[in-house]
């Protein structure tokens, strides 16, 4: 595919501002994408600043390499942000990072390129992998999973209330021929959905669940949050933008847990006074959402929510 798919970075100014960038600071962009946040952050850094970008997507890596060639302060790594702890340790940066940004979910170029297989609106190969060279594709999962496994993925990760009906329809149809195209799967799911939601494609939730499963998105998020906390220096900022309730719930619980501290889980009269049990994060402000102006310019920002925390110890 030679087509260029435009990506509008969500909460661009808000996210960069939340990082409170210092000119000589060291920062991590865990989800480089097409580099919107990274470019804006580099504008805030001085000659001594450093920015390390992560992405699994080969197309994002191409964009990142071009940026690295332009700007020696930037380095791109083809890894999931779930593995940022390993990369940070290898570079001797653990506990020295001033800010970590995670902009979760799928980028517009991934959604809009039919060949990537993420979209039910544009027909393409049923793939859905962020890195097409790793793991099993959506087509392979649909071909080999049991009816119960398919239903669980739709229910748990897509929050689809008709998951069982959809899974049953998929298993019945695949006995005739395998699913290889997104439009084919979307059609079967749509027919199996008895109650369409106004303004929402009937296949939306099922496709979300399938994508999250194929890419282990929630597992990666949990690992990435833990790694980000260990990577940060005291006073460093963690900024996370999520796009659906499952992601946001994980981020919210993680930040709240570390803002309360382990002592909150111990009996009140227990004679223990140790820094080990003190809070590790401080929540900064309330969750932020896209402005009316941004919503008009980029409707995909409507579900975005940004949470910010600062490392205390």
From Swiss-Prot:
Cellular compartments annotated = Cytoplasm
The keyword Cytoplasm is assigned to this record: yes
Q: Does Amino-acid biosynthesis count among this protein's keywords?
A: no
**What Pfam families does the database record attribute to this sequence?**
Methyltransf_5
Record-level GO BP terms = rRNA base methylation
Annotated GO MF terms: rRNA (cytosine-N4-)-methyltransferase activity
Report the catalytic activity: cytidine(1402) in 16S rRNA + S-adenosyl-L-methionine = N(4)-methylcytidine(1402) in 16S rRNA + S-adenosyl-L-homocysteine + H(+)
Assigned EC number:
2.1.1.199
A GO CC annotation given for this chain: cytoplasm
Q: Gene3D superfamilies recorded for this chain? A: Putative methyltransferase TM0872, insert domain, Vaccinia Virus protein VP39
Keywords on record: Cytoplasm, Methyltransferase, rRNA processing, S-adenosyl-L-methionine, Transferase
Name the major location. Answer: cytoplasm
Where would you find the membrane-spanning parts of this chain? none
Q: Which residues bind S-adenosyl-L-methionine?
A: 35-37, 55, 81, 103, 110
Which HAMAP family does its entry note?
16SrRNA_methyltr_H
The job of this chain, per UniProt, is described as: Specifically methylates the N4 position of cytidine in position 1402 (C1402) of 16S rRNA.
Q: What protein family does this chain belong to? A: Belongs to the methyltransferase superfamily. RsmH family.
Name it.
Ribosomal RNA small subunit methyltransferase H
Q: What is the lineage of its organism?
A: Bacteria, Pseudomonadati, Pseudomonadota, Gammaproteobacteria, Pseudomonadales
Originating gene: rsmH
């Amino acid at each position: 595919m030679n087509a260029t798919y435009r990506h509008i970075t969500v909460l661009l100014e808000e996210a960069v501002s939340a990082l409170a960038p210092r000119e000589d600071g060291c920062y991590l962009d865990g989800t480089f994408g097409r580099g919107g946040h990274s470019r804006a952050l580099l504008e805030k850094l001085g000659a001594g600043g450093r920015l390390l970008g992560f992405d699994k997507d080969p197309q994002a890596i191409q964009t990142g390499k071009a940026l690295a060639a332009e700007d020696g302060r930037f380095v791109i790594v083809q890894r999931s942000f779930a593995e940022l702890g390993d990369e940070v340790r290898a570079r001797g940066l653990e506990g020295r990072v001033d800010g970590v940004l995670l902009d979760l979910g799928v980028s517009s170029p991934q959604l809009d390129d039919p060949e990537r297989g993420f979209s039910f609106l544009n027909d393409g190969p049923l793939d859905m992998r962020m890195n097409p060279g790793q793991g099993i594709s959506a087509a392979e999962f649909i071909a080999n999973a049991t009816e119960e496994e398919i239903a669980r993925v739709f229910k748990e990760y897509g929050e689809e209330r008709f998951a069982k009906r959809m899974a049953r329809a998929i298993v019945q149809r695949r006995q005739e021929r395998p699913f290889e195209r997104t439009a084919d799967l979307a059609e079967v799911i749509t027919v199996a959905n008895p109650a369409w939601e106004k303004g929402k494609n009937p296949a939306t939730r099922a496709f979300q669940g399938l994508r999250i499963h194929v890419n282990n998105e929630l597992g990666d998020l949990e690992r990435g949050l833990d790694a980000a906390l260990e990577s940060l220096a005291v006073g460093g900022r963690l900024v996370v933008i999520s796009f659906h309730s499952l992601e946001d719930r994980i981020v919210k619980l993680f930040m709240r847990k570390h803002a309360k501290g382990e002592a909150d889980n111990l009996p009140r009269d227990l004679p223990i006074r140790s820094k080990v049990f003190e809070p590790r994060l401080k929540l900064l402000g309330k969750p932020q959402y896209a402005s009316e102006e941004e919503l008009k310019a980029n409707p995909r920002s409507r579900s975005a929510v940004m949470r910010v925390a600062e490392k205390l110890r």
